[in-house]
A protein has these predicted regions:
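Active-site substrate-binding loop(s) of clan PA
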Residues: 42-44, 76-77, 135-137, 150-182
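Bacterial N-terminal signal peptides that target proteins for export
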Residues: 2-13
């Protein structure tokens, strides 16, 4: 069992490197806005109790006696049917073949444990065991988007979807799990119109740039507008070559999200 645990640690580190490489687009310009806070949006978000609409996602892979967990991703709940919750995320977060999906919420206790011999800690097995199994219901044919479902007894919020795409200079807030900062919130503005992103990573998307700070672990997280409606899903960001400097984030806007949901609603696989 000890050898399995070591393989798990190695798999986590390798997964981190793999996901990080997806973010590096090689573009210049530093717009690190991690200390920006829009107090009015923060207050509206808290009043609407929307933090619990956001989730985190891990992949779990079992190979013989070894169990490994992939790097964290993010998502947001957009619908509910009883105890079944439906969430949007980035397709690349849930694309690992042969893996199980695990979802955690704001109420999941994220216990950690140290790795002997090195200054590094990972989530404990108790934390993973407390997460909810999830399934992929649909992967978009157009963008880095996916719909997943999980069942939970707890009461979680559902976010509404905006009617229109955000415009350049619109203020947004992003929610995700960057670098194991669970359910972190950042603020910024939309900085471009629609562009094509992600083609070199195999997950092309019609998306917009923004200045709200995101990092590894933010993939699939929510971008929220001033009216507290979902205006986009964040599939990634442009970072410096060493991964330490944020340049800009990317969001897939609601026009693309609605197309994804229309495709899903019309697909034979929808239950």
């Amino acid at each position: 069992m000890k050898s399995g645990r070591k393989l798990s640690y190695v798999s986590i580190i390798l997964a981190l490197a793999a996901v990080l490489s997806m973010f590096l687009t090689g573009c210049s310009g530093n717009t690190d806005n991690r200390n920006v806070v829009y107090e009015d949006m923060k207050a509206a978000f808290e009043q609407a109790n929307l933090l619990s609409a956001n989730i985190g996602i891990f992949t779990k892979t079992v190979s013989g006696d070894s169990v490994s967990y992939g790097e964290c991703g993010s998502g947001v709940i957009f619908d509910r049917d009883g105890n079944d919750y439906y969430a949007l995320t980035a397709a690349h977060v849930v694309s690992a073949e042969g893996s199980q999906l695990l979802v955690f919420t704001v109420n999941t206790e994220m216990k950690t444990e140290d790795i002997p011999g090195i200054d590094y800690s990972v989530l404990s097995q108790d934390a993973y065991d407390a997460m909810y199994p999830a399934e992929v219901l649909y992967v978009s044919s157009r963008d880095d988007l996916a719909v997943i479902r999980f069942r939970a007894e707890e009461e979680l919020s559902v976010i509404g979807i905006a009617e229109a795409d955000p415009a350049k200079d619109d203020r947004i807030m992003c929610v995700g799990n960057p670098e194991s900062a669970w359910f972190a919130i950042s603020y910024g503005k939309v900085t471009s119109g629609m562009e094509k992103f992600g083609e070199s990573q195999g997950f092309p998307s019609n998306a917009m740039r923004h200045s709200a700070y995101i990092q590894v672990g933010s993939s699939g997280g929510a971008a929220i507008g001033e009216d507290m409606k979902l205006v986009g899903i964040t599939p990634g960001a442009s970072l410096s070559p060493n991964g330490k400097t944020f340049r800009y984030g990317v969001l897939i806007p609601v026009s693309e999200i609605r197309l994804c949901l229309e495709e899903w609603n019309g697909s034979p696989s929808k239950e």
